[in-house]
Amino acid sequence: MKQWKKQLSAALCAALLLGCVPMPALVEENEEYDLSDIPGVIIEDPRIDPLEWNFALSLSDLDPELIKLANKECLLSSTYEPSSKTKMKLRAAPGAGTMYLQSECAEALAELFAGAEEAGYKLYLKSAYRAYKTQKTMYNNRLERNNGKDDGWVSKPGASDHQTGLGCDVVPGSWKDKSMNSNMASTPECQWMAEHCYEYGFVIRYPEDKQDITEINYEPWHLRYVGKEVARYIWRNGLCLEEFHEQLQAAIDAYLAAGGDARRVENLIQTSAE
């Protein structure tokens, strides 16, 4: 330690004589001080990743929970739950019962309902968070009624967007007592949602022109919260959530191939429970 301090003192004196580094205030012989406090001395922080993240959205815009993907290829575990749940107090469709959504999503949905009402439309919440066990029961019941055929109307357990706590079914007043089908898209309320939901951080999870990708029938009532920046990007580029993740994964692959820090992106990579 003494030898190190002698070398440091010599270096500082040399720098002072050369006019490169102004001498700090008098320092007691045994006083410890931080080199980074001395003008002209740069200490590299090993935690800083010098590699640039090359994607339209910054890493700070990408919340791993909010962009969580749930489908047949990317199954959620039977124990997966949103980080927080809020009991919904919005206008509900008859028979909907008690409903919950992930807390940030719940707040955003309340704002969307208010925006719709301001535009002259009254919306009803029909379905929200759904646990794995509940989804399993619904899926098996659908198979029984359909002679064992998966017709794309009810997701298999682990593949349901509702399990994320970020997916919800929102219907117009004229449909609050009816069975849901794609004809609902023609209502002014659903047209308003399709045009404006991104402003509140939502996207139409299962668009009409993406059924071959999502493998789910068109659901104009199914909103999915992803956050405002991601929703705006998806809306502007005409994507479904699967296509968004395809683009995001390509950016992640390029970043890692160039030597990027895996710790910065590992939570954004989608994995399946099976």
Q: Residue spans of the language-model regions?
A:
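Residue-level recognition of alpha-helix termini/interfacial anchor residues
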Residues: 3-4, 196
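Sec-dependent N-terminal signal peptides of Gram-positive bacterial secreted proteins and lipoproteins
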Residues: 4-26
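Extracytoplasmic cell-surface/polysaccharide-interacting catalytic and binding patches
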Residues: 26-128, 132-274
